[in-house]
Amino acid sequence: MKPGSTESFHGQELEFYLAEGNMNTRITHRTAAVAIAGLVGSVTLALQPALAATQLTGAGSTFVYPFFSKAFYTYSQQHSDVTVNYQSIGSGGGIQQFTAKTVDFGASDVPMNADELKRAGAPVVQVPVALGGEAITYNLPVSIPGGLRLTREVVADIFLGKISRWNDAALEKLNPRAQLPNLPIVTVHRSDGSGTTYIFTDFLSNVSKEWKDKVGTGKSVQWPGSNTVGGKGNEGVAGQVRQTSGAIGYVELAYAIENKMSTAQLENKSGKWLFCTESTVKTAAATKPNVSATDFSIVDRSGDNAYPISGYTWAFVYESPTDKVRGKMVKDVLSWVTGDDAQKIAGSLNYVPLPPSVQETAKKALAEVKV
């Protein structure tokens, strides 16, 4: 992908249909799996079941949804006895459903913390399953040669509400060739509990002491500023940015590409200007080859080609599932998802295949599941 450009998933389409007021995704052999912008509510992946197949259920991260949907469809084609229904409801919702024991597995862009693990009521195994980056997307009525440039500090000041108009001197200094409009900045954030938000606010807390002290890091935070709106899921944020002139928001890269959104160049910790791409996210991950459920952040890493808003998605299962048959099926699915074949699918959807060291971490974690 060229810097600043947008691409679609070649030859892959989504078909949507409405059923009793809910938006569901029907998977065909050409389905990619990205929820398009502007869709509100949970997006549920329903793999058409084979005869007598066992349907597993999962819920959580919208960040990982494009990858999960195609990966689970592919798995079901290879294993006719299993289908997977994955509900893209946000990391916070996924953790809630998992701890309520209404799903077989959950997924979040930040591992479960001590309080959440306590609510689970039994030992939990957390497994890194995907690696990706978050693009800063914007909607302006003017073309910006080479794409909008933002320093780390300016991103924080925009979301703090300190920079409130697009022709602010700080933005004009960074983008001297652009005719930035005298237009209010509308910041767009997640309205639901979100691992995508955790990664983004972790980045902001690393680059701005004011953000860290006033707002902090979390799946859900009190967003400062008077001109800010929320969207449910990555697809909701993408939709709000697309329909609001002067808007700026953060979404997982696959959503920005599928929706042909403008993305900003960010100045990283080493002073280099970078777009969110597979290459720049891969470099960020390479600076920390060993991650765990208690040491996982890869935001704002040093390195000329290290994109500063990068992160992993984690799946979680019970260490000793009550239903050993279903537990074995979930373990097998996640083993396949973290393996080479599925990670090639991730790469085709603008994620970054898990580094070998992280694949080994996933393998060791899944070995702890007793089925």
What residue ranges belong to the model's regions?
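Short, Lys/Arg-enriched N-terminal segments with co-localized hydrophobic residues
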Residues: 4-22
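Bacterial N-terminal signal peptides that target proteins for export
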Residues: 24-36
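Flexible loop/hinge segments at secondary-structure junctions
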Residues: 51-371
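Short, flexible coil/linker elements and helix-boundary hinge sites characteristic
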Residues: 19-20, 35, 48
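Small side chains
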Residues: 38-41, 58
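C-terminal segment of classical bacterial N-terminal signal peptides
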Residues: 40-50
